[in-house]
């Protein structure tokens, strides 16, 4: 029996690595933490007065706008909008399942 010859590996489709050296392993980022907003869940006198005086003058009125400007929760902003609608201070522009858009009431 003849001794076996060492066979060369078949040529692969990938090119051979050119000795690049060791690369540093990428670290995971810590991720950004969103700042907690401490919005009110009930109206106090000053905020309610501000709502009645300033909100009807806004060109665009949505629950998110009121929540951001008056520092109130989203559910309280929706209730405030219903109150302003009942008073006739604002009028509806568009209503959708997830977003309601209002504007100031004009004398038309």
From Swiss-Prot:
- Family, per the entry? Belongs to the eukaryotic ribosomal protein eS25 family.
- Which branch of life, at top level? Eukaryota
User: Where does the record locate the signal sequence feature?
Assistant: none
UniProt keyword list: Ribonucleoprotein, Ribosomal protein
Query: Which stretches are transmembrane?
Result: none
Q: Name which cysteines form disulfide bonds.
A: none
Q: Single GO cellular component annotation?
A: cytosolic small ribosomal subunit
For whether the record's keyword set contains Ribosomal protein, the answer is yes
Which PANTHER family is this protein grouped with?
40S RIBOSOMAL PROTEIN S25
- Output the Pfam families linked to this UniProt entry: Ribosomal_S25
Give the Basic residues compositional bias ranges: 22-31
Say yes or no: keyword Ribonucleoprotein present: yes
Looking up Gene3D superfamilies in the UniProt record yields: 3.30.63.20
Q: Name one GO molecular function term.
A: structural constituent of ribosome
Q: Report the source organism.
A: Solanum lycopersicum
Lineage summary = Eukaryota, Viridiplantae, Streptophyta, Embryophyta, Tracheophyta
What name goes with this protein?
Small ribosomal subunit protein eS25
Q: Where is this region: Disordered?
A: 1-36
């Amino acid at each position: 029996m003849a001794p076996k010859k060492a066979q060369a590996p078949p040529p692969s489709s990938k090119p051979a690595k050119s000795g690049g050296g060791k690369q540093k392993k990428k670290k995971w980022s810590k991720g950004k933490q969103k700042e907690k907003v401490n919005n009110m869940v009930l109206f106090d006198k000053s905020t309610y007065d501000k709502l009645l005086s300033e909100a009807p003058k806004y060109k665009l009125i949505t629950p998110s706008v009121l929540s951001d400007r008056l520092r109130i929760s989203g559910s309280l902003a929706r209730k405030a909008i219903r109150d302003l609608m009942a008073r006739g201070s604002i009028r509806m522009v568009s209503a959708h399942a997830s977003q309601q858009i209002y504007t100031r009431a004009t004398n038309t």
